[in-house]
């Protein structure tokens, strides 16, 4: 486990220091297209639909980012190589029917619809000559002579992975009384992963088929709003979602979905005839199996492909959010917010390489806050001009990497990072 290991620190390296090579590259191309269709049957019933296509290509060859590793000589780093060559195509479609009607004195706002998508990933795997490019010292780049040549990297396999997803849903917002509204809904989701195909490019393009898989689930959603006073509303909700995970595991298989339970409880206050709104929400979110970018590829090398992911275990987020909106003067808008989030691993497999139960996730600060103030001129030569400022605060957090059970490092991979504030004018 990670008990008793020394804390890590950030090396005293200037921001301007470049630890890559002069030949490395990362080329990405994105293409998107969409079409929408809207139709009104009458004042109460409307139909809308959307079709879209997305394509993403990435061609990457570089030394990898620095890892939390131990070297006897301070600052010494053996630079590993990474090669990524992927193409993703994503076809989606969605149709919704919105309607309003009454059953007796009870008012209903109905939403019913369906969505589907087809996802294809083509991944080239390479045989890179030498997993380690060379060794440098990040504290003093003059200690070693750096390589400048481009290593050989030959295509070995092409893996094509298709995924099909479909969902159908219905929800109804019911006004039981002028003070009480009830939201109830359910969604059925299906994910099919047909067998992927691996083409061995150096073996006469022979093809091997992987395993197919499918999963489906019903996901309920329920909520209630109670207007305690004209300007005070209380609300509570629960939702269960069948969250499909994009990307592939390190063996180019599709990831199973994650099940997420979310609970919310809050109050909405309106003061000063609508000039001031204050909302407070408490929440708990449980993800039964969080998908994150894989640390290593199937050969044990540091992973640079953000499309390769791993299921890391159950996480729990407990938090509270405060939102304030004010419009005291004509043209003046003030928005402020604060959030507290406590996110930890609450259940992990417990075997070697799994994350440590109870540890806070990296890059999840406990405290964040933001504020904006804008003024829009409505008279004279400056009519329509908007000026303002915004500030964002991110609290203390851990950078680096979460620790794993029986990890090779005898120190913590968590790096304490101080909070910061940015101001834009």
Regions found by a protein language model. Name each.
Residues 27-31, 87-91, 162-166, 214-218, ...:
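Residues that define the transmembrane beta-barrel architecture of outer-membrane proteins
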Residues 30-37, 44-100, 163-198, 217-243, ...:
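Surface-exposed extracellular loop regions of Gram-negative outer-membrane beta-barrel proteins
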Residues 31, 53-59, 99-101, 114-120, ...:
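Transmembrane beta-strands of outer-membrane beta-barrel pores
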Residues 38-42, 46-52, 56-64, 233-234, ...:
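Membrane-embedded beta-barrel scaffold of Gram-negative outer-membrane proteins
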Residues 88, 107-111, 115-117, 159-287, ...:
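Structural signature of Gram-negative outer-membrane beta-barrels, strongest in the C-terminal barrel
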